[in-house]
Structure formats: C-alpha cells, structure tokens
Amino acid sequence: MDIVKIICAILLPPLGVFLQVGIGKDFWINLLLTIFGLYILGLVHAIWVIARER
C-alpha cells in the first residue's frame, strides 16, 4: 500500500499525504508547498510523511 501512496505523492504530493494522514497539519503544509510553486519541496515533504507514519 505504501507504493501506491508514493506513486500518488509523485503525481500529486498532497494526495499522497492525504491518503496517509488525512486532512490535518501535514496535509495543509504540503498543499501550500505544492501550490506556491515549490513542487519539489512538496514532493520531499510527502515522501517524508509517508515514510514517517509507518
């Protein structure tokens, strides 16, 4: 299941975070990082959240 979340995070980082933790602090941080043109930071944050919440 983590592979699916990581693939979702690569395509759309907030989706990967949402699938892992739902709508919370990490989701909103990731959404802001992704929206403001910092896709790579959003991606790194999403992978970190997915790996951390195992």
From Swiss-Prot:
GO cellular component assignments: plasma membrane
TM helices/strands, residue ranges: 3-23, 31-51
Swiss-Prot/TrEMBL keywords: Cell membrane, Membrane, Transmembrane, Transmembrane helix
Protein species of origin: Synechocystis sp. (strain ATCC 27184 / PCC 6803 / Kazusa)
InterPro entries: PMP3
Family designation: Belongs to the UPF0057 (PMP3) family.
Superkingdom field: Bacteria
Membrane topology (UniProt): Multi-pass membrane protein
Name of the protein this chain belongs to: UPF0057 membrane protein ssr1169
Compartments, as annotated in UniProt: Cell membrane
